[in-house]
Amino acid sequence: MSSTLNRLIGLCLCAAVALPSAAVFGASSAETHDLVVYGSSPAALTAAISAQRLGKSVVIVCPETRIGGLTTGGLGQTDIGNKSAFGGLARQFYRDVAAHYRAPDSWKWQKRADYLPDGQCAGTHGDESMWTFEPSAALRILERWEKEYGLKIVRGEYLDRAKGGVSVADGRIVSFRTLSGRVFRGKMFVDATYEGDLLAAAGVSYAVGRESNATYGETLSGTQVANARHHNFVDGVDPYVVKGDKASGL
C-alpha cells in the first residue's frame, strides 16, 4: 500500500514540475520580430524591405511556396495611365524588369524589336522602365530581392484561423499561430494577403462586396448605373473643404 502511495505522490510531483516547464517552453518557442508580415504579395516584400532599411527585424510568413502573388502568378500587364505616380521599390521593380529584358537571352519567343515598343510597356520619358513582363521574370526579380536584402521568408505556413489562432490584446495583434503549430510574435503586423485573412481572423469587421448608400449615409457607394461608361466622375467635382476655396484645404 505504501509503495503504491509513494508512486502516486511521485507522479503528482513530476506533473507539477512538468506542466510549468511546458508552459514556459511554449512561450519561449514563439519567434519574435519587430515586424511580422503575413502574405507573399509584392506588398509583403516591399513592406519587409522598407522595415529592414529602418533597422527593424522582420519575418514574412506565407502559405505559398511561390512568392509574388498575382505579379508572379500570371498578371504581367501593368494597367496604369500615369506611370510617374510610381516611386520607391515599385519603380525599382519596373526598372529591374527593363534590365532583365535588355539581355538578349531573355527573348525566347520573339525579338525585342518586334515587341510593343510603345503603349503600355513604354516607360516615362527619361526613365528606364518596362511595364509588361512574364511572370517568370517577375519571380526571378523578387527572388533576387529576397537574397539581396536578406529577407527571412517562412513559406508553407498557413494561418490557424481557429479560435485562439490569433492573439489580440488591447485592440492590437500580439501573435498568431500557424497550422503547423509555429507561433510568430511581433510589435507590429502587416496583412499583405489579398483577402485580409489575418485581419479577419483578428476580429476586424469587414464587408463582402459594396455597402449600400444607407450604411454610411453616402450617395456614390453601392452599384452605380448612371455615368457607368469608364466609371468617371461627372465634371464639377470640387476637391476643397469649402467649394472653390483653395485656402480651406483638401
Residue ranges and their predicted role:
Residues 30-41:
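Beta1/beta-strand and adjacent pyrophosphate-binding region of the FAD-binding site
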Residues 31-33, 180-188:
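Core beta-strand elements of the Rossmann-like FAD/NAD(P) dinucleotide-binding domain
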Residues 44:
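N-terminal Rossmann-fold NAD(P) dinucleotide-binding loop
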Residues 56, 62-167, 207, 215-217, ...:
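Conserved N-terminal/central alpha/beta ligand/cofactor-binding core
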Residues 164-183:
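Conserved beta-strand-loop-beta-strand element in the redox core of flavoprotein oxidoreductases
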Residues 188, 192-197, 202:
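Glycine-/small-residue-rich beta->alpha transition segments that form the dinucleotide
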Residues 198-250:
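Rossmann-like dinucleotide-binding core of oxidoreductases
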